């Protein structure tokens, strides 16, 4: 992840043949700077995938896409919502139907609906060779379809938005906002995310990356502790747990070993290893 949290989200998924950006929730300048820190220029991007139209996922989109002619992949509802306030002149839309799959270069992209208070939010599963990456942020609860889509992934990016006690005791958010966040179309708490991960264990999953943390109502320590507790309960000490950060990126994060010759899936993310906590 180039950056992940309540203030903005953008993620780079790369193989040796392909570069895909997920969401544009950082400023256009920050997207460019952080891409270049990963050794990728905007001109090298093969596509920009959107999860939904909320500002923390698209706020940099208009300026970024005005400067760089990058195809935008999303469903029709999300495209229409974005066109209402920006990108009205953008021509390079690649509209998909939620639930379908398609390829970008050598990456198979699977799409599926997620419950969130946006017009038609989606999650993604990326497959290349025999390795898979699941990507779900901004959802209120896990559907059966979502769980099934993620059973074949080896690395999962999942939101751990808030600690329930910190959110309930927060003095800056009015009660209706707290209700929205905790609703079935809001955001996953640490405990709820840990429950999703448990449903994928045992299975192919080897690593989880926790993202979209609230600055005010969560900490990396609380998020990782919740998932670590679940890991110990199901006796999967081998499961790696990382946490994404809002204001930094990480070195290359490898999803798998070298596949099909020189093909090697990588995941650019702002991470720290929980062993250091």
Spell out what each predicted region is.
Residues 29-74:
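Active-site metal-binding motif and surrounding structural segment of the metallo-beta-lactamase
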Residues 22-25, 45-53, 73-76, 134-137, ...:
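Active-site neighborhood of phospho(di)ester-bond hydrolases with catalytic His/Asp-centered motifs
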Residues 59-68, 81-84, 218-225:
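Metal-dependent catalytic neighborhoods of phosphoester/phosphodiester hydrolases
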Residues 55-58, 79-81, 118-119, 141-144, ...:
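Active-site environment of divalent metal-dependent phosphoester hydrolases
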Residues 221-277:
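C-terminal regulatory/interaction regions
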Residues 76-123, 127-131:
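Metallo-beta-lactamase
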Residues 1-38, 122-137, 155:
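Conserved beta-strand hairpin/beta-sheet module of binuclear metal-dependent hydrolase folds
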Residues 144-245:
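Cap/insert and terminal regions of metallo-dependent hydrolase folds
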């Amino acid at each position: 992840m180039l950056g992940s949290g309540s203030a903005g989200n953008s993620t780079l998924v790369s193989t040796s043949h392909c570069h895909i950006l997920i969401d544009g929730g950082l400023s256009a300048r920050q997207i460019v700077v952080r891409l270049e820190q990963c050794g990728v220029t905007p001109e090298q991007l093969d596509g920009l995938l959107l999860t939904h139209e909320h500002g923390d996922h698209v706020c940099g989109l208009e300026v970024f896409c005005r400067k760089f002619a990058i195809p935008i992949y999303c469903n029709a509802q999300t495209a229409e919502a974005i066109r209402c306030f920006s990108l009205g002149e953008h021509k390079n839309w690649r509209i998909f139907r939620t639930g379908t799959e398609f390829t970008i270069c050598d990456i198979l992209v699977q799409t599926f609906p997620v419950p969130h208070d946006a017009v038609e939010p989606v999650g993604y599963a990326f497959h290349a060779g025999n390795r898979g990456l699941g990507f779900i942020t901004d959802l209120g609860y896990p559907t059966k379809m979502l769980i099934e889509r993620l059973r074949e992934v080896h690395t999962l990016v999942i939101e751990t938005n808030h600690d329930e006690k910190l959110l309930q005791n927060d003095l800056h958010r009015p009660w209706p906002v707290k209700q929205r966040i905790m609703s079935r179309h809001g955001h996953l708490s640490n405990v709820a995310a840990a429950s999703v991960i448990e449903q994928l264990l045992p299975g192919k999953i080897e690593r989880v990356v926790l993202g979209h943390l609230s600055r005010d109502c969560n900490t990396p320590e609380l998020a990782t502790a919740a998932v670590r507790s679940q890991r110990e309960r199901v006796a999967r000490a081998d499961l790696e747990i990382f946490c994404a950060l809002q204001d930094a990126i990480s070195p290359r994060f490898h999803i798998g070993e070298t596949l099909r010759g020189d093909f090697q899936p990588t995941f650019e993310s702002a991470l720290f290893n929980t062993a250091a906590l």
